[in-house]
């Protein structure tokens, strides 16, 4: 016997549950089918006596992420600021350099020009890319055929900014520079507010976390929906050839609906059989957008000893020998459960996954002791980690990335409906895609597409702006006059050559006027 409803939502992460909540609040009968034994998708809050609670998946929120902040507030959740009071550390070539601000400073004048030009150039290129249609950028084809490795080599004159740009790609996208399309990268950074916003803690994407963990968002929506959320129900078959759409799960339950919302990573669409088959371009798209590789690691200590040394816990670590490339303070807001969270990303995640959990912890502690200059780092009291590459119902983390050539060929089909199937998931968002904010935007947009299809709202209400959060207001990202107008290294060299030529001509003219040149 089939279970009947108005809408089946495939996927019980934040995007699917945000869609289900909006549809439920609009009076529709909705069922959510989640493959795992818990909701949350790529967010997961672990609870035990050693950690109280810890986010092993998506966790951070900040200014301009207004949808997730609004939804969390509706659900009764509060945020707290991630510690960013003390100094950060940039560890490079075996030495630690304290700094403040979003980016480590460059003391070499030539390197400073190169660093500054890298961030300004990437932000300027991003301004040419439409957030809702990156394939329409004037130079979309050229940029999409280029890897980020090629773009960094093209922009950077010196090695230091090239290496830091590589770390930036590894950290933000959990992929290697040769794996990622320059167009997709530039779009991704642009729709997150630019290079400074995406990398910053204060006034950036990592400013805050949720008290009690981000997993509560999905859990509280599940509590509102009750038995409409079905766990351990992997969807394996969707048939929309009849009057209703039939959705079958791995345990052979069949749900009959008017519409379906797919709120899973695009690549997981390959686990579902469709009748009729997906259109050609959509069918090929889902096999061409892999997810990144990351192991999230949290080391606990008896106290936040790094703060005594005037360090906030943020470490930017360069070098192939270092297991993690970025850390942050993960101590609870009341100062309890002192911890440092680190990210093993991209090829390092694939490499270090071969080690045991104990071996990874040892490497982390040895690295932290070296970077922080403290043997206290060698004395952890507890350790938790999550290898997202192992998750068959995620495929990786944080998000799907687009290899070269894919965005311009297939990008326009990412959220295009297929019959009575609509597509959500953070990858389909146009603002903070890859984050919890993007998940909410995508889920609510897909829900409004369904509401439009049944005649409840007009088409022009599908996409809706979001008012700025009163509790977490955004400050503008500013640059100095010098940062905006400094030349690149090649520009400086051209200026020097031009100045030299002009000076030589002027001296020659002056000498001739004064009769100092020999007459032949």
UniProtKB/Swiss-Prot annotation:
CC cofactor: FAD
Location of N6-acetyllysine modifications: 52
Residues spanning the membrane: 490-516
GO molecular function, one term: monoamine oxidase activity
Main localization (coarse): mitochondrion
Ranges facing Cytoplasmic side: 1-489
One GO location term (cellular component): mitochondrion
Modified residues (S-8alpha-FAD cysteine): 397
Entry keyword Transmembrane helix: yes
Residues on Mitochondrial intermembrane side: 517-520
Topology within the bilayer: Single-pass type IV membrane protein
Catalytic activity of the protein: a secondary aliphatic amine + O2 + H2O = a primary amine + an aldehyde + H2O2; (R)-adrenaline + O2 + H2O = (R)-3,4-dihydroxymandelaldehyde + methylamine + H2O2; a primary methyl amine + O2 + H2O = an aldehyde + H2O2 + NH4(+); benzylamine + O2 + H2O = benzaldehyde + H2O2 + NH4(+)
Localization (cell): Mitochondrion outer membrane
Keywords: Acetylation, FAD, Flavoprotein, Membrane, Mitochondrion, Mitochondrion outer membrane, Oxidoreductase, Transmembrane, Transmembrane helix
Site keyed Important for catalytic activity: positions: 156, 365, 382
EC number: 1.4.3.21, 1.4.3.4
Assembly behavior: Monomer, homo- or heterodimer (containing two subunits of similar size). Each subunit contains a covalently bound flavin. Enzymatically active as monomer.
Protein family: Belongs to the flavin monoamine oxidase family.
Main function: Catalyzes the oxidative deamination of primary and some secondary amines such as neurotransmitters, and exogenous amines including the tertiary amine, neurotoxin 1-methyl-4-phenyl-1,2,3,6-tetrahydropyridine (MPTP), with concomitant reduction of oxygen to hydrogen peroxide and participates in the metabolism of neuroactive and vasoactive amines in the central nervous system and peripheral tissues. Preferentially degrades benzylamine and phenylethylamine.
Name of the protein: Amine oxidase [flavin-containing] B
Lineage of the organism: Eukaryota, Metazoa, Chordata, Craniata, Vertebrata
